[in-house]
Regions:
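H-loop (His-switch) and adjacent beta-strand-loop-beta switch element
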Residues: 156-168
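ABC family nucleotide-binding domain
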Residues: 1-159
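ABC ATPase nucleotide-binding domains
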Residues: 171-173
Length: 173
């Protein structure tokens, strides 16, 4: 979205100058979003939740199911594609949300407290997925208050009162 103050560029373009259509395209194709509360549509199966961004991205109907199934398999949910969100654990729902965020192959993944509602086992599974994405060359921007989750990162930017107070590489204490 457009900044309320300051400016930033994405792919060399000033974001404030993009049209609404260009912003929508950018959100759909270049950035994948993962939320703490999953934001899955409760009346859609795991498969249909993952297909949804491809509908908005004008992916051919024939290709949608194949890509969605592959993405769900890649996060370990190949056997849950027909399940509804209410039939899945929190960790499974978060992996569906990750599959949905990745299905259009974005270069950037933004995750807002993606493990905040998960148990420790599911947290490790989800963080391993993000670590693998980083190894594949994706940019992963993750917001967390959990030190053990933050320690998966190779760079840390700490915000205090809306300003950057620290920016460093390495592990947190």
């Amino acid at each position: 979205d457009r900044p309320t103050k300051g400016s930033y560029k994405l792919d060399g373009k000033e974001v404030a100058n993009l049209t609404d259509k260009e912003l929508a395209y950018t959100r759909n194709k270049k950035i994948g979003f993962v939320f703490q509360s999953f934001n899955l549509l409760p009346r859609l199966s795991a498969l249909d939740n993952v297909i949804l961004p491809m509908i908005y991205g004008n992916v051919f109907k024939k290709e949608r199911k194949e890509r969605a199934v592959k993405m769900l398999e890649s996060v370990g949910l190949g056997d849950r594609i027909d399940h509804m969100p209410a039939e899945m654990s929190g960790g499974q729902r978060q992996r569906v949300a990750i599959a949905r965020a990745l299905v259009n192959d974005p270069a950037i993944i933004m995750a807002d407290e993606p493990t905040g509602n998960l148990d420790s086992h599911s947290t490790r599974e989800v963080m391993e997925i993000f670590a693998d994405l980083y190894k594949m060359g994706k940019t992963v921007i993750l917001v967390t208050h959990e030190t053990d989750v933050a320690n998966y990162a190779n760079r840390h930017v700490v915000l205090s009162d809306g300003h950057i107070s620290k920016d460093f590489k390495g592990r947190l204490l």
